[in-house]
Amino acid sequence: MTSEIKKVGVIGAGTMGAGIAGQLANAGVEVVLLDLLNKETGNNRADEAIERMKNAKPTDAFNAGLMIPDNAKNITTGLSNENLDMLADCDWIIETILAPQEIRAGIYQNIEKIAKPDAIFSSNTST
C-alpha cells in the first residue's frame, strides 16, 4: 500500500534542512519548517533560511532551494522549541539538526507524542 506525501515537516533550517524544504516546496508539497531563534538577530532561523533561498542565485549551491521565489508560499515556519504541534498532520517528518544525541532523543520523544500514527519519520543526521 502506498500513501501520498501531502505535507512534510522539516526540523532544522540549516543548509540541509532549508534545501530539503525548498525542494519539496518546488514540487508543490506543503512544508512546515521549524528552527530556533537566531540569538544574534532575534529572528526565526527558518524565516531567515527562506529569505536566503528567495534571494539566492541558481548557481549558489549552498543557498539553493527555491527554483522560483514564489514557491516559498508552500513553506510555513515555526519555532522548534514552541511549535512542534505544527507537525501533527505531517505525513513525513525529517529531522536535520546538529545537536547532541540527548537533545535529538528528547525531540524524537515529543514528536512521537504528536505525530499521526502513520507518519514517516527520518533523520538527515547521525542518530
Predicted regions span which residues?
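NAD(P)+-binding Rossmann beta1-loop-alpha1 motif at the extreme N-terminus of oxidoreductases
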Residues: 1-55
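Rossmann-like NAD(P)-binding element
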Residues: 36-48, 52-121
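A short beta-strand-to-loop transition that corresponds to the Sensor-1 phosphate-sensing loop
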Residues: 123-127
